[in-house]
Amino acid sequence: MKEEEEIGKPAKPKAKKDVAPGRLIDTYAAQCDNCHKWRVIDSQEEYEDIRSKMLEDPFNCQKKQGMSCEEPADIDYDSSRTWVIDKPGLPKTPKGFKRSLVLRKDYSKMDTYYFTPTGKKLRSRNEIAAFVEANPEFRNAPLGDFNFTVPKVMEDTVPPDPKLGSPFPSTTTTTSEKSSVKQSHN
């Protein structure tokens, strides 16, 4: 906690234009390696921690306090929301930065952005390298931890006519042993 205070407050994105509801991830989930039930993950940070270790330490229900495989699933994979699958093993976002994923209006894919502790939006590896070079206090942030790999949009959960926009106001991100999954729209 002290380290976070020294670096600065977590990034709060400064949006020039609002993103329509349902195009940002609002729920994170991980699939149990044993029972295959989906468990809602409380925060993006916790989700990224699970995803970064998924290959060597698969998620299971017992990793959530008070949870077991005997409990019903927290959330079901269905078309009531748009789901996106994340790749397991992606690194955690460096401290002080915020990774943002935005679903395109046509539901074809997601775009990845990073917000700096000052709120500046970075769209590419070159922009990140330039920011780190210009701000020596962030030189310890490993450039390899800024990953622009985007989750796969699960076509069977996309609304029938994406041009009309989603009838669902949210998105969920999830992770399983073979892949991490994120959901986008409720």
Curated annotation (Swiss-Prot):
GO molecular function: methyl-CpG binding; zinc ion binding
Motif (MBD-associated domain (MAD)): 31-69
Residues reported in the UniProt entry to bind Zn(2+): 32, 35, 61, 69
ZnF region ranges: CW-type: 22-77
Compositionally biased spans, kind Low complexity: 166-178
Coiled coil: none
Tissue expression notes: Expressed in rosette leaves, buds, flowers, stems, mature seeds and roots.
UniProt entry keywords in alphabetical sequence: DNA-binding, Metal-binding, Nucleus, Transcription, Transcription regulation, Zinc, Zinc-finger
SMART domains attached to this UniProt entry: MBD
Pfam families hit by this protein: MBD, zf-CW
InterPro entries for this protein: DNA-bd_dom_sf, Methyl_CpG_DNA-bd, Znf_CW
One cellular-component annotation, GO: nucleus
Record has Membrane as a keyword: no
MBD domain residues: 83-153
Subcellular localization(s) per the UniProt record: Nucleus
Cited function: Transcriptional regulator that binds CpG, CpNpN and CpNpG (N is A, T, or C) islands in promoters regardless the DNA methylation status. Plays probably a role in gene silencing.
Entry remark concerning the domains of this protein: The methyl-CpG-binding domain (MBD) functions both in binding to methylated DNA and in protein interactions.
UniProt protein name: Methyl-CpG-binding domain-containing protein 4
Taxonomic placement: Eukaryota, Viridiplantae, Streptophyta, Embryophyta, Tracheophyta
